[in-house]
């Protein structure tokens, strides 16, 4: 289908139309077996690969020296530190001055773990970076920095969330 000019996303949607889900009011157990079988593969391999391939990082222009620039560190720190700092510095005074409240059964540590995950802003960061650095070497460095910053935010957020659930 791709060779015929149909986009890969549309190919996947068309194929999904032919997977039987509900036949005569009964749930198709073979579909659920297939779903459970492929879910880890899709979550931990296909989706990350899809994100990386669509990020536009050019591996032929990649060098470690370009990753060690002040631009790259600024983007990484902005995503990893800046997002969580911004969310917490805005939210804490709002709660303390009773403009809003934390949801019930939510501690500040749990809220902080969500603030960390705010640094995963992958799509919007790539969009803004693409407008700022049209083509050239800074564009590739920006894309690598966004991936690194998003990964750091995701991994640290998961660690803090696991700590929150274990400390109960």
From Swiss-Prot:
One of its GO terms (molecular function) is sodium:proton antiporter activity. It is found in: Cell inner membrane. GO terms for biological process: regulation of pH. It is a multi-pass membrane protein. GO terms for cellular component: plasma membrane. InterPro entries: Na/H_antiporter_dom_sf, NhaA. It holds the Pfam family Na_H_antiport_1. The chain crosses the membrane at residues 1-21, 37-57, 70-90, 111-131, 144-164. Belongs to the NhaA Na(+)/H(+) (TC 2.A.33) antiporter family. This is Putative Na(+)/H(+) antiporter NhaA homolog.
């Amino acid at each position: 289908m791709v060779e015929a000019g149909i986009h890969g996303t549309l190919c996947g949607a068309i194929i999904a139309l032919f997977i039987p889900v509900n036949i005569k009011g009964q749930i198709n157990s073979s579909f659920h077996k297939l779903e459970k079988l492929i879910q880890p593969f899709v979550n931990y391999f296909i989706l990350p690969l899809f994100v990386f391939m669509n990020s536009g990082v050019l591996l032929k222009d990649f060098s470690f020296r370009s990753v060690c620039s002040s631009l790259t560190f600024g983007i990484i720190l902005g995503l990893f530190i800046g997002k969580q700092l911004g969310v917490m510095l805005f939210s804490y005074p709002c709660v303390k001055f009773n403009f809003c409240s934390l949801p019930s059964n939510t501690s500040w540590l749990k809220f902080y773990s969500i603030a960390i995950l705010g640094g995963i802003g992958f799509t919007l960061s790539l969009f803004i970076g693409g407008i700022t650095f049209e083509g050239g070497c800074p564009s590739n460095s920006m894309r690598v920095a966004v991936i690194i910053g998003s990964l750091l935010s995701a991994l640290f957020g998961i660690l803090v969330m696991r700590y929150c659930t274990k400390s109960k």
